[in-house]
């Protein structure tokens, strides 16, 4: 049986992550409060951010920026701004 969580991002009960994907306290918070669907949305945004801003994951400043964007997206309901990207109309 799948583990369910109340997803902070999507504001609904949904399947939780299978295991903690991010280290530390933030990783525990993500595991306890973010569903698979929201995590997949973040991974798409993360890839776009890394590519468009040409982030280097070996650079601590770039990792810090990406982590802040992740917190903003998953927990504060903020959209990731990617210059030149227009989301498809719904």
Swiss-Prot record:
Coiled-coil region list: none
One term under GO cellular component: cytosol
GO molecular function: iron ion binding
Biological process per Gene Ontology, one example term: cellular response to oxidative stress
Keyword hit for Iron: yes
Gene3D superfamilies: Fe(II) trafficking protein YggX
Transmembrane portions of the chain: none
InterPro entries in the record: Fe_traffick_prot_YggX, Fe_traffick_prot_YggX_sf
Keywords: Iron
NCBIfam families, per database record: PRK05408.1 (NF003817)
Family: Belongs to the Fe(2+)-trafficking protein family.
Physiological role: Could be a mediator in iron transactions between iron acquisition and iron-requiring processes, such as synthesis and/or repair of Fe-S clusters in biosynthetic enzymes.
Protein name: Probable Fe(2+)-trafficking protein
Organism: Vibrio cholerae serotype O1 (strain ATCC 39315 / El Tor Inaba N16961)
């Amino acid at each position: 049986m799948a583990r369910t969580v109340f997803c902070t991002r999507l504001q609904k009960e949904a399947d939780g992550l299978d295991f903690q994907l991010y280290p530390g306290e933030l990783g525990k918070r993500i595991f306890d409060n973010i569903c698979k669907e929201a995590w997949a949305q973040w991974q798409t945004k993360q890839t776009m951010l890394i590519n468009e801003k040409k982030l280097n994951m070996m650079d601590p400043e770039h990792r810090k920026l990406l982590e802040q964007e992740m917190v903003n997206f998953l927990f504060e309901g903020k959209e990731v701004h990617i210059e030149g990207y227009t989301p498809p109309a719904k």
